[in-house]
């Protein structure tokens, strides 16, 4: 059986984004994160953020950067060991 691209690769940083979102004080909801991103000109709704965190949606580089800024963490915190 031939593997599809979807089966071979996945978004590896989604769970780390979720961890960073929930570590904020107070924790940031997906809706709140969507609002913070919209204020920065990046339009991801709650559903898109959920898909990112569950590793079913890929991210663009500018989205990773905007999410890090919105959560006040470094981009590097999304990479490496959890």
Locations of regions flagged by a protein language model:
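The DNA-recognition helices of helix-turn-helix-type DNA-binding domains
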Residues: 40, 56, 81-82
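Generic non-transmembrane alpha-helical segments
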Residues: 16, 20, 36-40, 70
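Short alpha-helical elements of helix-turn-helix
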Residues: 15, 31, 47, 61-64
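A short, Lys/Arg-rich alpha-helix, primarily the initiator
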Residues: 1-26, 76
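Phosphate-coordinating loops and pocket residues in cytosolic domains that bind phosphorylated ligands
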Residues: 51, 80-81
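Short alpha-helical DNA-recognition segment
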Residues: 26-51
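DNA major-groove recognition helix of helix-turn-helix/homeodomain DNA-binding modules
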Residues: 36, 56, 60-77
């Amino acid at each position: 059986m031939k593997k599809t691209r979807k089966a071979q690769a996945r978004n590896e940083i989604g769970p780390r984004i979720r961890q960073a979102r929930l570590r904020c004080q107070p924790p940031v909801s997906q809706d709140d994160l969507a609002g913070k991103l919209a204020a920065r000109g990046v339009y991801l709704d709650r559903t898109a953020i959920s898909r990112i965190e569950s590793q079913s949606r890929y991210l663009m580089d500018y989205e990773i950067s905007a999410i890090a800024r919105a959560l006040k963490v470094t981009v590097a915190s999304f990479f490496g060991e959890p």
